[in-house]
From Swiss-Prot:
Activated by the benzylsuccinate synthase activating enzyme BssD. Rapidly inactivated by oxygen. The gene is bssC. It comes from Thauera aromatica. It is an enzyme of class 4 (lyase). Induction: Induced by toluene, probably via the TdiR/TdiS two-component regulatory system. This is Benzylsuccinate synthase gamma subunit. Heterohexamer composed of 2 alpha subunits, 2 beta subunits and 2 gamma subunits. GO terms for molecular function: benzylsuccinate synthase activity. Its EC number is 4.1.99.11. Coiled coil: none annotated.
Length: 57
């Protein structure tokens, strides 16, 4: 089973951040549309099961 911490889109939350929790991170994916490029972010934990956007580090 692959987890979020093995994904290239997983970024850990720094300890000095307001929303810091142990093993918490953000899943950040890049999207493109007719207006340009943008990024989507959602909170996840290291041990969550990976989603369909998984990309090995």
């Amino acid at each position: 089973m692959t987890t979020c911490k093995d994904c290239a889109f997983f970024f850990s939350i720094p300890e000095d951040a307001d929303d810091f929790e142990k093993s918490k991170g953000d899943c950040v994916t890049q999207k493109d549309d007719e207006k340009g490029r943008y990024w989507l972010s959602k909170p996840v934990f290291e041990n969550d099961q990976c989603c369909g956007a998984f990309h090995k580090r």
